[in-house]
A protein has these predicted regions:
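Glycine-rich, N-terminal phosphate-binding loop and its surrounding beta-alpha-beta segment
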Residues: 40-112
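Rossmann-like adenosine-cofactor binding region
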Residues: 245-335
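Adenosine-phosphate binding glycine-rich loop
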Residues: 3-4, 200-201, 305-415
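Flexible, glycine/charged-enriched surface loops at secondary-structure junctions
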Residues: 24-30, 98, 135-144, 167-170, ...
Length: 415
């Protein structure tokens, strides 16, 4: 059987939820396809004087609840179906955390590692030239994603502002603080995930103070998951890993010290006082909380039965395959699905938009308080849905989100 592409996967997820919700055929048909998509050719003069034409996309999946929102990806293997799927998932993610936005996503087929700083800037600015009429603070708001940075967002915001003839800080989120970025964005994904873990721990009678945690992946999300778990919730981080391998210490690892060790050596491996552990064995540790924070499809039908964590908090995108999901659910392991668990990022991006519109900067405490409120409400809505429809947490998250989008469509007279 041929492997399904991401958009076919997203459509199948929708089809299952449409049956649960008894959606009529017209509503179902509207939700299966993007509202709008743009394909652009982006000619760039390279540093050697030649002209190279790049291909780019912007997909706006559904804007019934508000302007579309989603990142821009620079990747050599980017495809329109990947962008379509990610735009669909952004639609459901925004609805789940109940922010007044729809889902969008963009991408350029390129390898940013092969481009100079000047070529990256010209590519970023020309992309905005090509999509200018389709984006805007009230229409579609891009953000960073794979291989795009706050600096790239700065160039894009500046280019949009030049064409518009006035400053438009709210057209892009994920900007540096000095030009309208928001405090609390750096650790928002991990922090939002921990708010969900806290609520799950209450539900299952787990005391997070002293609870054992294993984290696969020690990039931005994994590092902050370890740091916040240790410093705010008092949990014991017993294992972490990166692409080169993992480390284990039953008494606990110092998250900041491990981060500094990785910055110095290029990996978490060989951290003083730790034992080596493979990424595969880390997933199977007997811990209270397992945090996949790196690759997709690491929990599969082959290893799901060996997972012993009480809670799996999916900070990474797509770490669990559908067949593994069923096994974990049957074994009583509580999975906080990715597009709930990692929704802190888009939530604080929304907060950045609000601050830009009002020209008023919130304090870090205000950002954290509002993020906590959104994530806690989304978690409990998903938990209620799981019990109401007798489905696992992932399916419940989709059902809750799709139900909210459909309600908005009905209210606006779209269906």
């Amino acid at each position: 059987m041929a492997k399904l592409n991401p958009f076919e996967i997203s459509q199948k997820q929708l089809d299952i939820c449409a049956d649960i919700l008894n959606l009529d055929s017209g509503t179902h048909a509207i939700l299966r396809v993007p509202m709008r998509e743009l394909h652009v050719s982006i000619p760039i003069r390279m540093d050697d004087g030649t002209i190279k034409v790049f291909q780019g996309f912007r997909v706006q999946y559904n804007d019934v609840k508000g302007p579309t929102k989603g990142g821009i990806r620079f990747h050599p293997d980017e495809t329109i179906d990947t962008v379509r799927a990610l735009a669909a998932w952004m639609t459901w993610k925004c609805a789940l955390v109940d922010i007044p936005l729809g889902g969008g996503k963009g991408g350029i087929i390129c390898n940013p590692k092969e481009l100079s700083q000047g070529e990256l800037e010209r590519l970023s600015r020309t992309y905005i030239d090509k999509v200018f009429q389709f984006i805007g603070p009230d229409q579609d708001i891009p953000a960073p994603d794979v291989y795009t940075t706050p600096q790239i967002m700065s160039w894009m915001m500046d280019e949009y502002s030049k064409i518009a003839g006035k400053n438009q800080f709210g057209v892009i989120t994920g900007k540096p603080m000095c030009i309208g970025g928001s405090v609390g964005r750096t650790d928002a994904t991990a922090r939002g995930g921990w708010y969900c873990v806290r609520e799950a721990a209450k539900e299952f009678g787990i005391d997070l103070k002293g609870a054992t945690v294993a984290i696969q992946g020690y990039g931005n999300a994994g590092y902050y998951a370890a740091l916040l778990g240790q410093t705010i919730f008092g949990s014991t981080i017993v294992a972490v890993s990166d692409s080169k391998g993992g480390i284990y210490n039953a008494a606990g690892l110092d998250a900041q010290a491990v981060y500094e060790h990785k910055a110095k050596t290029g990996s978490v491996i060989d951290f003083p006082g730790s034992e080596p552990i493979t990424n595969e064995d880390l997933l199977e540790l007997d811990v209270d909380v397992l945090v996949p924070a790196a690759l997709e499809h690491v929990i599969t039908g082959e290893n799901a039965a060996k997972i012993r964590a009480k809670i799996v908090a999916e900070v990474a995108n797509g770490p669990t395959t559908p067949d593994a999901d069923d096994i974990l659910h049957e074994n009583g392991i509580h999975v906080i699905p990715d597009f709930l668990c990692n929704a802190g990022g888009v939530t604080v991006s929304y907060f950045e938009m609000v601050q830009n519109f009002n020209r008023y900067c919130w304090t870090e405490e205000e950002v954290h308080e509002r993020l906590d409120e959104r994530m806690t409400a989304a978690y409990h809505a998903t938990l209620r849905g799981s019990k109401k429809y007798d489905v696992n947490m992932r399916r419940s998250a989709y059902v809750v989100a799709i139900e909210r989008v459909v309600e908005a469509m009905e209210t606006r007279g779209w269906v």
